[in-house]
């Protein structure tokens, strides 16, 4: 038995902890059955070995969310923590212990000893350099950088990390992230050796120029950065190298940089000769500038990285000097080129343009994703050169490269960028179509996971909030997004208005959409993410601290919604956006008040549960009283008690009413029957839109209609997932018929319709983890074998470890195998809900 994956604030050791009350967690590795933690003891020491907290022996089974309760943590310190646990099992008592460490952040602005330096002219870019010598042998070196909008950094010619587009996107008026690195390895042994720090700046979302395609123009100021290198010498003395007027700057190779328009890069200013020169013609004194408005905080989420590389599946010359590369899949990121020249091509340009699709002539089509998006590289004299953009990305599959030299002298690869987060699950089954659907949904999720969940990786790149809760359960099956959800809740808190409103987009980079429809600013289905997203994070990760920290934000928003009701019903918002019908994209099948009030009631229900968890009994009772009023008025206005239809009986109206708990018990059967009849009579076609779709899936699962979902997911005509697969989609598209042959339309890379993962994992795989209603340390294993599936293998990660369910049909029976991690209790149930047995950790095999 051993402990592993020791976490501080949900990340492994050597992370930068921004909280003064971090939370700890761990997992247990053992082959023994029914292992359960009986007690733990957490101890924390500072750099000098002084104890700052000792929890003492705590009798608890809890292995996640253990909050620090010791002395106040100090800035910029390396802390060590140790956990020792006792366990019970079928084979008796056991013990295990392990140690980890973490770094505390700079908690105060005064901890930064330097000043911001940066650009003095809009959309002009420089390289920044500092030369210095170490007075003594270096024992430890830590580098802290806040770069607005984004930066890359080198020490002595070595890139200090493989992170990209750091430090992340926020409302820069409120919050500016910084990052930290252990850079000890970049300093050679010995004293008085010259060292060089080099920083490259770009704009990203901080400063968005025009000039090419741009979805919006907005500026939080000119590019700037703050840097602090902390050197700890062998004798424990310290020295700091910080940004000030002593730094030098030179014209950057970046000539144009726009998150929406692309990047132009002059390789002649990215050579050893240029970078190492000391002439005043190239290098001039840096300029100190005003700091950004936002509070400096360590980035709480994992950094972006190049996570996958795609090689071209085909290359063809589409016209003289223009080469088209097909990378086989739609994804988000950039292309990297490798050139070999005779050394006499300096000044020549290579232009790269991208697209998700081809037009009728077989050429790239940027009509949806942003016309004229491009990367341009100007060659230098070196014989071997390499280029990829630094501070922009897009969604694409095809690249057209314009260069007069034969293709054999240049190679190209696609680089898929998303956060450096753990894969949290996967799903496989005997049904090839289902596997393909899972693949395109997962590809869209990864493509749109950046500093927040984007709607698409090209046209808008905005944080439309509804996605965070509508497909939150589906995302959480696949990726560990715990820290990203923490960051996004911070975005919502930063964007909240005085009256409590949470705008639809956070960070709120774009304003003015409400001139077309007020719902683009204020829609309950979007703003309610501030309540529902952290609740799902609590259900999935057990993060009570997140609920406690942001409870005032949630409360203020729900009060705002209450102020907008008329007879307890809400009447504003976008409703069931992009539902199926002739009047898309606006809600046409379901009245807006039905959709908005369902979400409002769901908010009240969740807030009552959160208040109870936080010990706010009177607040919980107030929400429960409000729920009763909304329940009565909603059913008075919308329920036809003769037919069991809500409003016009749409799929969204029926499903949402069921899932949020607005259906009186005596009418449940009628409401369920109406829902099933509507789906079946339409040939298992979907009519629900962005908002209603996940509730439709959840309702069919909850009320014993997994077989209906099986039929819906197997069809290959529109609207449906299968239609996208058979028509060549490699990522989930914005509209159900997006890849229509001869009329490919809309974004070909959207994640908002990806809720089918809930059925794949939760019903076929039998692992319902968010909507199950069970306590955090209990799970239900209830697979539903369907006629189109012969076997399933699905797994997902719980904070305590891996849950794996496999099943295979054998004659008239289905044999189930499951793996339960230590610390969990599993209810093994048949498809009809009969309990087979209750088990602890271990491997189990049984028949259903």
Model-assigned labels for residue ranges:
Residues 1-459, 466-467, 483-486, 499, ...:
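Extracellular/oxidizing-compartment recognition motifs
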Residues 141, 155, 334-344, 349-354, ...:
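Alpha-helical support elements that line or immediately flank enzyme active sites
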Residues 150, 242-251, 398, 409-440, ...:
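Active-site acid/base region of carbohydrate-active enzymes
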Residues 151, 160-162, 492, 509-510, ...:
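Active/binding-pocket-proximal capping segment
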Residues 197, 265-266, 271, 460, ...:
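C-terminal capping/lid segments that line or modulate ligand- or cofactor-binding pockets
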Residues 217, 226-228, 241-274, 298-303, ...:
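Non-catalytic C-terminal accessory modules of carbohydrate-active enzymes
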Residues 508-512, 518-542:
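Charged, long alpha-helical assembly modules
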